[in-house]
Amino acid sequence: MEEEYLNPINIFSEIGRLKKVLLHRPGEELENLTPLIMKNFLFDDIPYLKVARQEHEVFVNILKDNSVEIEYVEDLVSEVLASSVALKNKFISQFILEAEIKTDGVINILKDYFSNLTVDNMVSKMISGVAREELKDCEFSLDDWVNGSSLFVIDPMPNVLFTRDPFASIGNGITINKMYTKVRRRETIFAEYIFKYHSAYKENVPIWFNRWEETSLEGGDEFVLNKDLLVIGISERTEAGSVEKLAASLFKNKAPFSTILAFKIPKNRAYMHLDTVFTQIDYSVFTSFTSDDMYFSIYVLTYNSNSNKINIKKEKAKLKDVLSFYLGRKIDIIKCAGGDLIHGAREQWNDGANVLAIAPGEVIAYSRNHVTNKLFEENGIKVHRIPSSELSRGRGGPRCMSMSLVREDI
């Protein structure tokens, strides 16, 4: 791979053959969800960890069988922190600060607690959370009791499973994202340290957007259609201001992309990101919850070099026609379950549109979305099915559970 790609990040399409991907192994963080708190952590039900791991392993094996190299976010962070005691201590302090621990005694106990763990176990524990009962000798303040969690000193991070969102690969660079929900913001510390300190990634990876921005941006809303064209969703989790900031950064730094299409979709739990209702699966084929244009308002952002300003216009054409125009080819859109009112809504809810392309016309999909998967195959798409009785409880499909790092150029 080093011979083929000079940069550790190489994403210039959604469908080029996938060569390298970032995942997270489901861990004990899922066991720390309870019925009372699961909604706060963006889960609609409690996954059974044993089966979730089995389902995820099927996903991993399909990727490996198709010669995809797999990196794990927890491994990369551990490698960074194992390289320097000073860096490990800095990370611990930042992690505790961003967990909003305010009492000095609790801060000091947590620093000792994490410092005495091996790096691997420390990272795992930071993700799974630290329960109050684990710090038996800790004296909590009134503020800790009143404003903190009754169960955890450090909350679990079950959404680390969805590696698509905390950062996103665009061209040879990345966005380290400002997450919309407070419960997910600590996830991006991992990306910050990987791309600032890891020997494989700290060089030659420009950062187009950073985690301290005021407006939110999440990877489920970021799409690279080709070397000229991006699509960014404006959704429940990504704000319009972030699209403008990202565009300004890309144009200022002379990234190759000349046009950004901003797709505004309804702010709705079922459509939290654009990739829950829309993905590309072949050169000329997309899947969408619906082709009804009431769901999409489209804006075009381009750069005017003469005025040094970003031009923004509202696109009046329909979704299919907009895609056809900017991609220069006729486009087909396969609707979830063919647009059936019952099956379409059910399968979109279970991530029928959230498939991961591993090559042009070849995707990984949840097996439960049988109507949509059959339509894919009838339209010449090769479908690799994975079980999802537990993985789907977090409302994320194969694209959500993966961040593409390297794809073949097309």
From Swiss-Prot:
GO terms for biological process: arginine catabolic process to ornithine; arginine deiminase pathway. InterPro entries: Arg_deiminase (IPR003876). Keywords: Arginine metabolism, Cytoplasm, Hydrolase. Its main location: cytoplasm. One of its GO terms (molecular function) is arginine deiminase activity. Its EC number is 3.5.3.6. Pathway: Amino-acid degradation; L-arginine degradation via ADI pathway; carbamoyl phosphate from L-arginine: step 1/2. One of its GO terms (cellular component) is cytoplasm. It comes from the Bacteria. The active site is at 400 (amidino-cysteine intermediate). It catalyses: L-arginine + H2O = L-citrulline + NH4(+). It is found in: Cytoplasm. Belongs to the arginine deiminase family. This is Arginine deiminase. It comes from Borreliella burgdorferi (strain ATCC 35210 / DSM 4680 / CIP 102532 / B31) (Borrelia burgdorferi).
